[in-house]
From Swiss-Prot:
Residues 1-61 form the TGS domain. Catalyzes the attachment of threonine to tRNA(Thr) in a two-step reaction: L-threonine is first activated by ATP to form Thr-AMP and then transferred to the acceptor end of tRNA(Thr). Also edits incorrectly charged L-seryl-tRNA(Thr). Binds 1 zinc ion per subunit. Its cofactor is Zn(2+). GO terms for biological process: threonyl-tRNA aminoacylation. This is Threonine--tRNA ligase. Homodimer. Transmembrane segments: none annotated.
Length: 642
């Protein structure tokens, strides 16, 4: 009979099989009331599942990440329960958990309106407030199939036929009269599912195949308590205000149009930000001793076949042909960098060789996945590849890590989650090589005092990698930086160097990106700063304004002086009230507004005002220029007097 070992090491002995709920009750009624599920020998199970042998057990509650995920999954079933009551002929497809919530794909003979969604949410609340028990039954494959055939659930039948073995015992979850099929676990009672909201609907093809029927996807969010739900909805509201597409239009940064889906038309102010970002990256390339190169936009398909990209990536590649040759528009820069490395004989003395490029890449992303600057078809990577020996890997990775944190800190990103992906089952190279490579990456992270978590088996077949995910002011995750070891591509493309023993050897290649895509990173920055770019990045850094025509000459002189000092400046001499001008440039998020009245002209000064509405008073012109230059030069995130 089972001996149950709890997380604190204590043990409980039973003379009969017990469930996680039984153990929780044994510990105390408070824990039993909070129990959502259990983790038995590392595997999540329902609170009602029986444990027949000795096992370790952790009780899962709403405070656990897994508990919240289970709540969300059960809310998807609750949605199914409600929709079948409102529209009984609905056919249910799949209802998984996603970030911050869940969705359910349904086949319904009407297009859901906003009023329908509100009615559906209301019915979900009515059902959840009944606090009914969720009953799990493990049945044979044949019984499960018969259940769903009788209920006309053709999609569930298809899942059984195509995805579940005949000797398996699927779990059927009974929500009163509604039955759904799932691996589970799910909540034992609907009292855990009171804090949710339906968010939107969208179209989705069955199994993601455009040849199949288009279903309606209903998205929802769910949380453990009302406070967490409200906080999330507030974050969404703030995110909507910060949407880079909205701000991009307001500030005239860029646009996109139907004739070039997923391609950016940069306007002057947006392109100014892009170029300033390039200047910043170039300064870091110089500091960390990189060469900068430029490869062609397209290369013969034969080359992409050699690299393996054609076999694995051709659907995402744009192609063209000329003179009976097929060319691929590059989706990435690495093969081109190997071609540059291969020009001329290389010695071990030439290594490490660090090669960087602002590479213009194109990928044929599905049109439905395109999203402003965040998901595009044409983008610029701040890409680099380091060619080195195995002995140099650790030092080079160390330098890459320092560079990543150096650059992210400039933008104020402090919360960065790091993951190390290790060898997959299918891979090239010896175990010894992988042992050393993984150890080199881990030691480099440890030497920089960076906490990280392993993603076991998630590395590429050609080498392990480090991923850097930064979190913005709304605590949203953005995976931007990567450091990826590659033991395959140099060999495939015949890259070599002459070692100390005069023998030809294949270099290790380190793929390194920090911002990822320039376009996407500008989108992230736009939302992070809500369009209030730090002065060094702002398209227009200063606007000089007159109050009346009598100050026009002084404004022009001052504007020229600022321009000569390397400051991006505009003069506003319009015959408008000064309050109107200040408000307009504040809405345009211009960092500084310099106002010139008769007093300022007479004293050779200027009244300085920030876009946040702070009045810095009347200051000496040369002092203002010096302070602005210092703020811009240091790439400060703070404005004067902040």
């Amino acid at each position: 009979m089972p001996v149950i070992t709890l997380p604190d090491g204590s043990q409980r002995h039973y003379d009969h099989p017990v469930s996680p709920m039984d153990v929780a009750l044994d510990i105390g009624p408070g824990l039993a009331k909070a129990t959502i599920a259990g983790r038995v020998n590392g595997e999540l199970v329902d609170a009602s599942d029986l444990i027949e042998n000795d096992a370790t057990l952790s009780i899962i509650t709403a405070k656990d990440e897994e508990g919240l995920e289970i709540i969300r999954h059960s809310c998807a079933h609750l949605l199914g329960h409600a929709i079948k009551q409102l529209w009984p002929h609905t056919k249910m497809a799949i209802g998984p958990v996603v970030d911050n919530g869940f969705y359910y794909d349904v086949d319904l003979d009407r297009t859901l309106t906003q009023e329908d969604v509100e009615a559906l949410e209301k019915r979900m609340h009515e059902l959840a407030e009944k606090n009914y028990d969720v009953i799990k039954k493990k049945v044979s494959w044949h019984d499960a199939r018969e259940t769903f055939v009788k209920r006309g659930e053709t999609y569930k039948v298809a899942i059984l036929d195509e995805n579940i073995a005949h000797d398996d015992k699927p779990g059927l979850y009974h929500h009163e009269e509604y039955v759904d099929m799932c691996r589970g676990p799910h909540v034992p009672n609907m009292r855990f599912c009171h804090h949710f909201k339906l968010m939107k609907t969208a179209g989705a093809y069955w199994r993601g195949d455009s040849n199949n029927k288009m279903l309606q996807r209903i998205y929802g969010t769910a949380w453990a308590d009302k406070k967490a739900l409200n906080a999330y909805l507030q974050r969404l509201e703030e995110a909507a205000k910060r949407d880079h597409r909205k701000i991009g239009k307001q500030l005239d940064l860029y646009h996109m149009q139907e004739e070039a889906p997923g391609m950016v038309f940069w306007h002057n102010d947006g392109w100014t930000i892009f170029r300033e970002l390039e200047v910043f990256v170039r300064s870091k390339l110089k500091e960390y001793q990189y060469q900068e190169v430029k490869g062609p936009f397209m290369m013969d398909r034969v080359l992409w076949e050699k690299t393996g990209h054609w076999d694995n990536y051709k659907d995402a590649m744009f192609t063209t042909s000329s003179e009976n040759r097929e060319y691929c528009i590059k989706p990435m820069n690495c093969p081109g960098h190997v071609q540059i490395f291969n020009q001329g004989l290389k010695s071990y003395r030439d290594l490490p060789l660090r090669m960087a490029e602002f590479g213009s890449c194109h990928r044929n992303e599905p049109s439905g996945a395109l999203h402003g600057l965040m998901r595009v078809r044409g983008f610029t990577q701040d890409d680099a590849h380091i060619f080195c020996t195995e002995e140099q890997i650790r030092d080079e990775v160390n330098a890459c890590i320092r560079m990543v944190y150096d650059m992210y800190s400039t933008f104020g990103f402090e919360k960065i989650v790091v993951k190390l992906s290790t060898r997959p089952d299918k891979r090239i190279g010896s175990d010894e090589m992988w042992d050393r490579a993984e150890a080199d990456l881990a030691v480099a992270l440890e030497e920089n005092n960076i906490p990280f978590e392993y993603q076991l088996g998630e590395g590429a077949f050609y080498g392990p990698k480090i991923e850097f995910t930064l979190y913005d002011c709304l605590d949203r995750a953005w995976q931007c930086g990567t450091v990826q070891l590659d033991f395959s591509l140099p060999s495939r493309l015949s890259a070599s160097y002459v070692g100390e023993d005069n023998e030809r050897k294949v270099p290790v290649m380190i793929h390194r990106a920090i911002l990822g895509s320039m376009e996407r990173f500008i989108g992230i920055l736009t939302e992070e700063f809500a369009g209030f770019f730090p002065t060094w990045l702002a398209p227009v850094q200063v606007v000089v304004m007159n109050i009346t025509d009598s100050q026009s000459e002084y404004v022009n002189e001052l504007t020229q002086k600022l321009q000569n000092a390397g400051i991006r400046v505009k003069a506003d001499l319009r015959n408008e009230k000064i309050g109107f001008k200040i408000r307009e440039h504040t809405l345009r998020r211009v960092p500084y507004m310099l106002v010139c009245g008769d007093k300022e002209v007479e004293a050779g000064k200027v009244a300085v005002r920030t876009r946040r509405g702070k009045d810095l008073g009347s200051l000496d012109v040369n002092d203002v220029i010096e302070k602005l230059q210092q703020e811009i030069r240091s790439r400060s995130l703070q404005q004067l007097e902040e």
